[in-house]
């Protein structure tokens, strides 16, 4: 009753009144227990299972057509559903069912301009959070997702199409992205087209381009061509594919070919003598403009314009990839790359599996990740990364045995996997991969079992440096002769090292960091094959076990590692003239026990992804 304190009843222990159960009523704050009564403990609880289980039950209700309050009519298909689920997932349906539209009161709603199967897949996603995008459905799924404003599915479709990019289909994907306002996909397809123009211009899609799209492409300063002759030849091939229809469009298109950049011989002998060019006044004017530019160098400052601007040169450089490893107590699948030209670390596509202790090397400009440990299991699977498409593929044959802490290198067109451990024992097994046959073959085993071994190739030989035999770190080194299929012992290092970094620099093998019996190491040494001797090199600034070592654009770089306390995301660059290591930061992840590889890429390639 308003204005009066509430009564509260509390249980009295048996024996207080001679009754088993009774009540004692008090007046006061209903949220406060009487003195002497302990306050209850609190235990907040959040269920991880609840959302999934709830969705599963609601989906069962849908399948049994129970509690459904709307039927979507798509073509000849009727799809039973719940308005609240559709509204929660799709702004399109939320506007439809919560506004004043007629559909908000209808039990059957007709949805037009959408594929039946695509709608089924999207409704399934609303109830299950799962969908499979594939080549057979992406072209109907993306427009449907756009209509229903399902941003997540739009992104998934665009990501799928990015992975399918090829010189034969990039123009179609570009047009598809433009139609459906997928800006990121359009940007990627544009970059891909520009970089691969020499192959794209030979495709059927190129010949079918409308004039406005052709102009968009050839107008780009980023077009990857050896000379402007290729652009002219591409335009003339396009015109002659359908001469009668396209001849009137030639002057408009030719304006975007940079004729002043052609050689005089090609301009006069090929362009000026072409019958289609000669027969059109506007085309002849463009040729005359180019001739004047070439013949009157003193007038060139007054003649500058889009047609005289050189296309940006395609620069080549090496890019460093850091793959997998151990971070924050777990194996990781992430991959990042370092471009020395921009001094930037950027994330790229992750591997399909988490891998620490992974062996990494580059064969035919493709990055291979071999074996490793995913945090619970030892792996024999292999993945391959293509930097041109930013994709990992798992269609590489597995090694014959599971391996982590394995050394991997390329010699004579083969990928070698050396040593490691399989979860039972330390290995001396060596096998090599033939990319043409997609097959691994055993070769001669090392004389010593080695995990955490570093490998390098120099002078046609494969070197296995240090590691551990399963009991203690090693300073021994073996060299494999592929002609003899034999391993030979050579001079040992000055320091025992496992999980070290190794690379060939200035015709010598450098071994850095790692761990000995007691601690992580910052020391470094190098091997001279001419004298069969190891000699000390100035130590790095940081101790680094699980360090990666690579040569990038002529610079020796030590990447990541563990200093005994902290996982590192720094790199050090060796300066042989000053005999010092210079420390740099910038990696996205602190990493231990991953792999590194170096791929030569054009400037354009390195900026597509």
UniProtKB/Swiss-Prot annotation:
The keyword rRNA-binding does not apply. Pfam families: BACK, BTB, Kelch_1, Kelch_KLHDC2_KLHL20_DRC7. The keyword Protein transport applies. It is found in: Cytoplasm, Perinuclear region; Nucleus; Golgi apparatus, trans-Golgi network; Cell projection, Axon. Its main location: cytoplasm. GO terms for cellular component: axon; Cul3-RING ubiquitin ligase complex; cytoplasm; cytosol; dendrite; perinuclear region of cytoplasm; PML body; trans-Golgi network. Gene3D superfamilies: 1.25.40.420, Kelch-type beta propeller, Potassium Channel Kv1.1, Chain A. GO terms for molecular function: actin binding; type II interferon binding. Kelch repeats lie at residues 319-365, 367-413, 414-460, 462-507, 509-554, 556-601. This is Kelch-like protein 20. It comes from Pongo abelii.
